[in-house]
Every structure is written in structure tokens, then in C-alpha cells.
Amino acid sequence: MFSCTKAYEYQNYSALKRACLRRKVLFEDPHFPASDDSLYYKGTPGPTVRWKRPFDICDDPRLFVDGISSHDLHQGQVGNCWFVAACSSLASRESLWQKVIPDWKEQEWNPEKPDSYAGIFHFNFWRFGEWVDVVVDDRLPTVNNQLIYCHSNSKNEFWCAPVEKAYAKLAGCYQALDGGNTADALVDFTGGVSEPIDLTEGDLATDEAKRSQLFERVLKVHSRGGLISASIKAMTAADMETRLACGLVKGHAYAVTDVRKVRLGHGLLAFFKSEKLDMIRLRNPWGERVWTGPWSDTSEEWQKVSKSEREKMGVTVQDDGEFWMTYEDMCRYFTDIIKCRLINTSYLSIHKTWEEARLRGAWTRHEDPQQNRSGGCINHKDTFFQNPQYIFEVKKPEDEVLICIQQRPKRSTRREGKGENLAIGFDIYKVEENRQYRMHSLQHKAASSIYINSRSVFLRTELPEGRYVIIPTTFEPGHTGELLLRVFTDVPSNCRELRLDEPPRTCWSSLCGYPQQVTQVHVLGAAGLKDSSTGANSYVIIKCEGEKVRSAVQRGTSTPEYNVKGIFYRKKLSQPITVQVWNNRVLKDEFLGQVHLKTAPDDLQDLHSLHLQDRSGRQPSDLPGIVAVRVLCSASLTAV
């Protein structure tokens, strides 16, 4: 994964460290200096900040003291509980934090070799489709010899402070981390995809079955190494950081550090009882103000759990900000969950393997409608199709598809007043099985995301077999920015961008001809087909000028619904389009009949019910069956 890591600001960690050791100096980062510019992008600085190296703060600095734990972290003066909550989640996953903090043993202070320390660290973050290696020096902002931002329980443990500094460097300054989104940090730590869940939507509070399904999904993400966060929405500025009677805090991001089904009871009998309780462990980045309801640290409910089970769960009575609660109570009090899924693309895994397609694009403005790529959402029908378009295929009868679009992070532009995200989203349309060019008219909408001014938008949906077009858009037309599209399917989806509006003219066009007409054929279904006692196993083939489109087989019915479309750019208008119906058999497929379609340039999408004919164009009495077809035809190749 990290062989393709890109050096941020072209700073090579190894080369910089070697140069410092050779010159016997401590590294000073020219790209993120120890100055107010690295602290603030606006406003008046507070108390005088002194930048100090760890050995100026304590006698025996360490990256880690007794390993790394979610208990290590405490939020500082900047309002970035979202980042600290993400760090708490990261600390609970060794395989993940060792990717963010590479070669940590080499970066650790070595008391036996003090001359090997050069005051330089580096950390890896996933940013807009690639891993970047961020170099920082070890000068940290302090007031009265105390770290003013993220810090550890132990005064001589420092891993979280330089990680935060590297993340602030990416954002432009520490102040740019104020008021962020936990989902963004979780993605930046893992390269996964974040799925936000609104616990107030639908009837989760009252529907036990839906609640149980969601718990299983949360448990699955946690058990497969994903990261999870939860929060209580603050509806007004006055609500921010308000403490509820139960001890929870509004507008605060909590890290989910464990998810499990807890066995109730004592002794051998407990192993044979089926009673288990769905429970969640969370942590407040402040390290205090914890849950005081049922199953809190000193709650009598813990008497229902055996001592061995409590030890296995790590239940302690400490004011460390970590606490257990039932999943039911979590759904009652919390309003939002963020699941960061680590998408498994390894063929060697025992778990489900996904195929990922990753494409970059952009919303760009242009006066020419055919070159404009910033058309806004579907509300703007005149310009909607002037957006980037991406086509992909679902090759199974039905497949779960994960789709995420991300806009380039903008925190680093806050200094110029440009740090706000665009409102973005996307629609997915089922299109013709042979489409190769951009859409110009509406087709069946298969799914759509919400529109929100967040860095990324995610959708998980089930799609039947076929070809689809994703149209990612900004909410309003005319807005510009870069985008990253990620599509995950069970088998390769052949996802690619549609760039051309119509077939290109080449040097052969004058010899072989150029299309004069575009025709869309939509075969909806059939009725009254010749069948056996179990019904026909039929499919259709649409033929036009040597090109074929075939539907899936519809089994065991004489009234199949094919719902298959083909689009054809036609040169020989006198040749009819043929729709053939076949019966799928073991040895040889059986021809059931066909119809010929003759079109005119002004044909609309009228529904035609046509009787099947034999190959000679006759309609014998022993050839039953009717095919329902819609045809759309135009002399303008960009009409469909």
C-alpha cells in the first residue's frame, strides 16, 4: 500500500533526517514554521505561545509509554474533538495506527543513542485517493510549559501531538481543524469509506428488527477492523457541548472502542443460556463526563455479568472517559453514527472481497454546453446532463454496490476564505446495455444519494444486472472543483468516464458512412409465449446493423418482463431493427419468433404491442406471442 506514498510538499523524510544528522542539527520545517501562521488563519492570538521540543517539556520524552491506547488522548484548546475521537478509534487498531505512524520504532527516542535523534517525524494520511507522507519537526505549541492541543495522559508520551501537527499542516494551520467531521479523519487514517447513519430517521427507536439489523452491521464493521464514531446533534450554537442529565455531551464526537454481545449470568449455566445483550463501549475525547445511566462504570447492572466476562470486556471503574452502554440506549440518546468501512480488496481474505474502481474528475465551467461539466443537480433540467458521467456494469443477477464521491479537501484554503465544501451528490440511472456515449435525456433512476456540503457522499444500494450511469453533481450549476469517484462491486464493473456525446467522425466516415439517426429500443416484456408445462425460459435479442443486445433469461413464465434497452447509431435507415424471442434449452435454444421495427426520425416513445412472426415475416397460427416494445428515434444523435 505504501510503496506509492507521495511525499507531501516534496519533503523526503529519510533524506531530511540524514542531512540533519550529518550536520548535527535538529530539523526545522520551513513549510510549517513555529509561528502564529501555523496556529491561526484569522482572529487575534490568545496567550503567548511558546514552541518547545519534547525534551524541553519533560526529561524522558517517548512516542509511546506502555504501548498505544485510546486512553492516551485528551482534547486541547482547539475544537477538534472530531479529530481526537478519530485518533482514539485509531489507537485501538494496531494494524491501522502502524500505517499512519510508519517505522515507529525508528522514529522513537533512543536513550542509548541520543545522537540518532534529529527532531523530525513523518506520518501517512490518505488524501483524495492517494497516501501522502507528511514531515513535521518536533516543535510543539505550549503555554506555561503545557501542550495546548492534543496531549496524552502521560506527560512524557507524545505520539498524538506530532500526528495532530502533521494533520494541521495538511489543513494549513491548527485553527483550520476547528469544527471538522469525524468521518473525514477516519477516512484519512484508513483509506476506507465512511457511511453516516442518522439514528433519528425512520423508526429505529421503535422497530426492534431494524435496530437489530443495524447492530449486526455495526458489529461487522468493528469485527473486520473498521472504525466507528457516534455523536448527539446540537441543534443550536447554545446546545454545543451541553451536558445531558445522563452525562452525555451534545455536539461531541465519541469514539466507539468496542462492540459486542455480552453474555448475562454466572457460572457454567451462563454458557448454556441464550440471553445476550448488545453493548457498545465509547470514549469521550475530554477523558471525563461519561455516561451515568444503566451499565455505567459503577452501575449495579454489572452484577448480572460474571467476573470473567467483565475482565474480558475490560470493565474498570476509572474516570478515563470510557464507558459501556446498551445498544438500545445508544439508539435512544445518540443521533448519528459514522461507520468507516475498510473495503477488503485482497483475494487472499476469508471475508468478502470487493472490486474497486477509482476515477478522478472535475466539475468545470465552459461556455460551450458540450464542454461544460458543471450543470448542477436534477432541479436544473436544462443543464443537468452537462455534468461528468461515469458508466459501470453489474454483472450478477443482483449485487450490493458501494459508491462514494469525494471533493478535494478545502481546509487548507480557509485562510483565503475558500474553505467551505460544495453541496454535492449523485444520481444513478439504468441505461441501455450497449451505451457507449453520454446521456442526454432522462432514463430510469435506479438510486440517488443525498445532497450535502460534506467532503464525501456515500451510498450503499442493491442493483439488478445491467449497465448504469452515475452523474455526480454540485447542487447548484456553475460551481467548480475536483472529484474522486469510488465504486465497489462484487465483480469488476468496467467503470469508466463517458467523454463523447456521439460517435466520433474519423477518416473512414466518408467511406463507410456516418450515423444519420439514433434509435433507442426498449423491450418491456412479452405475453402468450409458446411454453412447456413449466413455462418458457425466454430471452430477447435486439439486432441492428450487425450489433446485438441480449436480455437475461426469464425462467418459468410465458409472460416475461425483459426490461432491456439497446441504443443504435444507424447508417442504413432502410434496414429494419429485429427483435427476436428465444427459449433457453439445454442442448439448443429454440426460436420462438421475431418482429421487425421500421422507424422514422420523429418516432416518440409510444408503446407498441407486436405479434411474433416467423423468420419469413409471416404470422402462423401456431406461433403465439406478443412483444411489448417502445421505440425512440431522432435525427439528432444527442437526443437520447
UniProtKB/Swiss-Prot annotation:
Q: Which cysteines are joined by disulfide bonds?
A: none
C2 domain location is 499-617
The answer to whether keyword Hydrolase applies is yes
A GO molecular-function descriptor: calcium-dependent cysteine-type endopeptidase activity
Q: Which InterPro entries match?
A: C2_Calpain, C2_dom, C2_domain_sf, C2_III, Calpain_cysteine_protease, Calpain_domain_III, Calpain_III, Calpain_III_sf
**What are the EC numbers?**
3.4.22.-
- GO BP: any one term: luteinization
What superkingdom does the record give? Eukaryota
UniProt protein name: Calpain-5
**Which organism's genome codes for this protein?**
Rattus norvegicus (Rat)
